[in-house]
Amino acid sequence: MKIGILAIQGSIVEHKNMLERLGVETVLVKKPEHLEIIDGIILPGGESTTFFTILENRLLFDALREKLVNGLPAMGTCAGLILLSSRIENHPDQKTLKVLDITVSRNAYGRQRESFSTYVKIPVIGDREYECIFIRAPQIVEIGRNVKVHATFNDRPIFVEENNILGLTFHPELTDDPRIHEYFLKRCSG
């Protein structure tokens, strides 16, 4: 199995290290042709407007969207989630991939200094609580009817799934706990 990591910005190395720790080969996705050799893709955190600009410049936006619409499993964390979303409440003109039927609000928990971590129950990955690290995180403010909510914090979804797409408002790659990545890998292997 080969998992791609959208290698534009953000926590690329951290996701790569986690996947390699799990024995998974990784591909740093920088060009459309990289999408042809992967079994799933991670869209890491970063700055969502920058992601879009670079995706467009590298002709990756449409190619990635087509792959996702056709079933390529994806996991978006933080800004990656924003990129996957259908709507951005506080930036309605920002273009997104529109493959996850959610509305998000960018930087909803505040600025960098308001970043925090907390432990939550996520039943789909086991009984033990999971440390969720929020860094200038988005909030999911609305979900479509086919979106499953796997975890919440303060009554807001923080981990959702729709078809082949996982979306997280937090950064699982910044923990030592591989369970979120393991869950994603199960989705990639069918």
Swiss-Prot record:
EC annotation from Swiss-Prot or TrEMBL: 4.3.3.6, 3.5.1.2
Residues noted as binding L-glutamine in the record, renumbered to the chain: 46-48, 106, 135-136
Keyword Methyltransferase: no
Keywords, comma-separated and alphabetical: Glutamine amidotransferase, Hydrolase, Lyase, Pyridoxal phosphate
A Pfam family it matches: SNO
Pathway: Cofactor biosynthesis; pyridoxal 5'-phosphate biosynthesis
Coiled-coil parts of chain: none
Subunit structure: In the presence of PdxS, forms a dodecamer of heterodimers. Only shows activity in the heterodimer.
Listed name of the protein: Pyridoxal 5'-phosphate synthase subunit PdxT
Taxonomic source organism: Dictyoglomus thermophilum (strain ATCC 35947 / DSM 3960 / H-6-12)
Annotated gene: pdxT
